[in-house]
């Protein structure tokens, strides 16, 4: 398995000589993406069990910082929280195919709401599909 740093470096996909972070408009775009994603999560009975109410604002901040860093922005996530260790950090939640599919449905809707360029959309969705599948930690 590749290290997070290797994945972060691999994610610095360039479009016309800029990172995805720069191409989509920087931190503000990722803040909007995550806000729209969690609006869907908050209304989803499958995912509400995975996201405790008292931690939604913390989850929002963590995901925003992680995505900003992953897609080529500042390394604030790692500076505050250390190595992302995505699988380890998600082990305490029961994530099966149903939860993964619900998560991906809301993230895809949030991405599409931004109306990104097709090549950027593909990069984002490919990453979210792969990563959400890797978070599955219980059988179907």
Which sequence ranges carry the predicted segments?
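Short, motif-level signal for alpha-helix interfacial/capping segments enriched in acidic residues
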Residues: 21-23
């Amino acid at each position: 398995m590749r290290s997070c740093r290797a994945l972060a470096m691999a994610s610095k996909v360039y479009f016309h000589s800029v990172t995805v972070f720069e191409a989509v408009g920087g931190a503000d775009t990722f803040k909007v993406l995550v806000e729209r994603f969690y609006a869907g999560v908050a209304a989803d009975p499958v995912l509400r069990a995975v996201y405790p109410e008292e931690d939604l604002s913390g989850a929002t901040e963590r995901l925003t910082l992680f995505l900003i860093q992953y897609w080529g922005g500042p390394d604030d996530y790692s500076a505050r929280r250390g190595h992302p260790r995505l699988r380890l950090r998600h082990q305490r939640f029961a994530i099966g195919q149903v939860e993964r599919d619900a998560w991906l449905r809301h993230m895809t809707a949030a991405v599409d709401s931004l109306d990104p360029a097709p090549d950027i959309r593909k990069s984002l969705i490919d990453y979210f599909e792969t990563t959400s599948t890797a978070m599955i930690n219980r059988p179907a």
